[in-house]
Amino acid sequence: VALIDNGIYVDGKRTGNPHTLTETYELMRERHGMAWIGLYRPDKEEIQSVADEFALHPLAVEDTLGGHQRAKLERYGDTLFVVLRPARYIDAQEVVEFGEVHLFIGPGFVVTVRHAENPDLAKVRRRLEANPELLALGPEAVLYAVLDEVVDAYGPVIAGLENDIDEIEDQLFGGDPAVSRRIYELLREVISFQRAAGPLREMLDSLQRGADKYGVDLELQRSLRDVLDHVLHITDRAASFRILLENALTVHSTLVTQQQNDEMKRLSEASLEQNEETRKLSETSLAQSEEVKKISSWAAILFAPALIGTIYGMNFTYMPELDWPIGYPLALLGMLLSGVILYRVFKARHWL
C-alpha cells in the first residue's frame, strides 16, 4: 500500500485520520488544516492524484515517479520540491546504505514520498505531533524536522566510516594483500556519501535566503542554521576522509612498488649468486678437465715404453728380435722416441 500515513493538522494538532487520498482532500478543505500525506513507492495513479490536487509541477512529478535522483531543492511557484538522500551505516556488513525521500512543500500541504525504508518518517511525525507548537508553524516545520532527521542520521555514518578508516591504517602497514580493495570500497562509499550530503549546504543556504520572503518563523530559521552547522561539520569530515583514503591508496601503491622492487632485487641477487656458483663450478670443472688431460697425457707417454717393454718381456720361444745384436738398443730407442713424440703432440695441443 503506497499510502502509509496521512493526517490533517489544525494549530499543530491532528484532527483526523483519513484512509484514502480522496478523504484527505475533503477533510483538508472542510477543516482548513494542513495535510501531511505520506507515500511509500506510490504508483503513477497515486502520484497523479496528488499532483492534480496540489497543482504539482510535471517535471517534479516525473522525477518522483522515476526516483534515483540526486539531492536537490527546486522551487516551482509557491511549491518546494526537495530530494534528500538519507544514509545509514550497516555495522554487520561495514557498508553505507542510501535511501531516497522526496518532499513537496506548499501552502497548507506536505507530501513525502519514500523510495526506500530509510528514513523513518513515522518517527519524525511522532516527534512533531508531540510538539504542536512547532508543527503549528506549518509545512516548513515538517521540512525542518525531516532535514534534521536525515542530517542527524549522518552522524553514525561518519563514525562508522571513521572506524573503518582506522582499521585500514592498521592493515596498510600490516602487509594485508586485500587492503587495496578495501580502500577502494571505502573511497567509493565516501564519495557516494559526499554526493548525498554535499548538496545540503547549498540547499539550506537557499532556504535561508528565501526565509523572509516566504514568512518563515524566526525560531525555525535558527533551527535551520543549526542544521546547516551540522551539515558543514559532516561534509568537512567526509572531505577529510576522502583525502585520507586517497593518500592511503598512494601509500599502498608505493609500498607495493617497494615490495616488488625488493623482490626483484632479491631475485637478482639470487640469480647473481647462482651465476657465481655456476661460474665457480665451470672453473672447477675446467680445472679438473685440464688435470685429467695432463694425467691422461702422461699416462699415454708412459704407456708406450711400457707397451714395448711388455711385448719383449713375454716368454715366447721364437722372438727373432731377441737374437739381434742391436735389438736391445732399438727397443730403448723405440721407448724414447714414442715418449718424445707423444710429449710433443700433447704439448702442441696444450694438454701439457
Description of each model-found segment:
Residues 232-352:
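Hydrophobic alpha-helical transmembrane segments and their immediately adjacent juxtamembrane loops
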Residues 1-240, 269-290, 321, 351-352:
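Peripheral, non-transmembrane regulatory/ligand-interaction domains of membrane transport proteins
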